[in-house]
């Protein structure tokens, strides 16, 4: 089961409220500091560099833990890894995603696959299931239903169980008002029902991960 402290931290980033983020960081002081950093580092893909930099600065203040060493990866491996990770997250919708984003702008398509999934989401330090659950928790609070849909489904595609996504949604909804929380839960319920129909047709367990990336 992914560390709930990481999910709470990710969700708090969507509030843009320093008090909420600080409280989540204080709650995460006992978590793996590398994992905490990875949650903060990947957040720049969704909340932008300014908020991510501010969050990293706040973490240094709250934790007094120095930055971990650079991953020192060879960028030449990011393109292939990005395609692999992105196709895992999007499953059968991967080709359609690439076509749609490429139609918006071909450079954005490359930035998404190579930069987003190859450079960031696929990097070491945090497993893909936890990364996707953290992304979903953040996006639920950030209020972007289309992208939230993709990453709730992507969490299942990466190997999260329904119970694990339930937890991420519950944590995120703790930061939301009644109407927003209801909308998030309704979206997740629709995705869960769709996944259940697919699992039933394939003869899988109702709570089995679609594709477990945790080894």
Give the location of each predicted region:
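A structural feature that tracks compact, well-ordered secondary-structure segments
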Residues: 12, 23-27, 124-125, 135-158, ...
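Residue-level detector of family-conserved "landmark" positions at structurally sensitive sites
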Residues: 36, 165-166
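Acidic, glycine/proline-rich low-complexity segments that act as flexible tails and inter-domain linkers
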Residues: 1-5, 11-35, 41-128, 157, ...
């Amino acid at each position: 089961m992914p560390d709930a402290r990481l999910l709470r931290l990710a969700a708090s980033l969507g509030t843009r409220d320093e008090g909420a983020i600080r409280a989540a960081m204080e709650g995460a002081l006992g978590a793996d500091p590398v994992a905490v950093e990875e949650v903060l580092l990947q957040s720049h893909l969704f909340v932008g560099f300014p908020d991510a930099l501010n969050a990293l600065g706040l973490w240094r203040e709250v934790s007094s833990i120095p930055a971990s060493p650079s991953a020192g990866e060879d960028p030449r491996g990011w393109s292939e890894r990005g395609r692999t990770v992105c196709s895992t997250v999007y499953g059968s919708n991967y080709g359609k995603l690439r076509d749609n984003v490429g139609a918006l702008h071909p450079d954005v398509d490359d930035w998404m696959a190579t930069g987003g999934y190859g450079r960031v989401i696929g990097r070491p330090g945090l497993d893909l299931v936890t990364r996707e659950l953290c992304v979903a928790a953040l996006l639920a609070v950030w209020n972007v239903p289309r992208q939230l849909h993709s990453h709730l489904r992507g969490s299942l595609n990466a190997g999260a169980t329904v119970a694990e996504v339930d937890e991420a949604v519950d944590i995120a909804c703790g930061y939301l008002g009644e109407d927003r929380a209801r909308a998030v839960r309704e979206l997740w319920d629709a995705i869960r029902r769709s996944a259940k129909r697919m699992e039933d047709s394939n003869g899988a367990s109702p709570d089995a991960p679609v594709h477990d990336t945790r080894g």
